[in-house]
Amino acid sequence: FGVQSVIVSFDVVETKQGEYCLYARNGMLKRMYEKKVPVLSKIKLLDSIGVGEYLITSVEREGTLKGLDLNLIKSTSNGTSSPIIYAGGASDLEDISKAFSCGAHAVSAGRLFTLHGGFKAVLVSYPKRSDIKSILNDKL
């Protein structure tokens, strides 16, 4: 096993001051000991001890289909060479493409692919392979 087998997951909430803070229990509990620690500082610390990948979830956007937090992606992806997977709010394939342009290595999307129509009925659907290839710039 290598460093890629060690993944740390963060639940993140943006404060009124525009700072991204680590939260627990779906954003209901702010970690008191991390009150003043920006997410990027924590990533740098974890990089130094060998964490190989991160999963960062924007709690406020999770399940909303209102778009990924592109500011969060830009601010965290530039601070590490480790891959980061982003979750929370993916609204369509264009939104995922924007995330890649901002530095995301991968994007997690649940509701985008399961709930459809006016009644938000469960209907698992996937984009066409050609659409995926265009987002990934024909890397497949």
How should these model regions be labeled?
Residues 96-140:
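C-terminal helical cap(s) of enzyme catalytic domains, especially alpha/beta-barrels
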Residues 71-109:
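Catalytic cores of alpha/beta
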Residues 18-22, 65-67, 96-98, 119-120:
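Short, well-ordered secondary-structure micro-motifs
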Residues 7-11, 57, 85-88, 108-110:
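A cross-family glycoside hydrolase active-site/sugar-binding cleft signature
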Residues 60-62, 90-93, 113-114:
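Short Gly/Pro-enriched loop/turn and capping motifs at secondary-structure junctions
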Residues 1-55, 60-61:
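Conserved anion-binding
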Residues 36-40, 66-75:
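Charged helix-capping and loop-helix junction motifs
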Residues 2, 24-27, 72-74, 102-104, ...:
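Short, hinge-like loop/turn segments at secondary-structure boundaries
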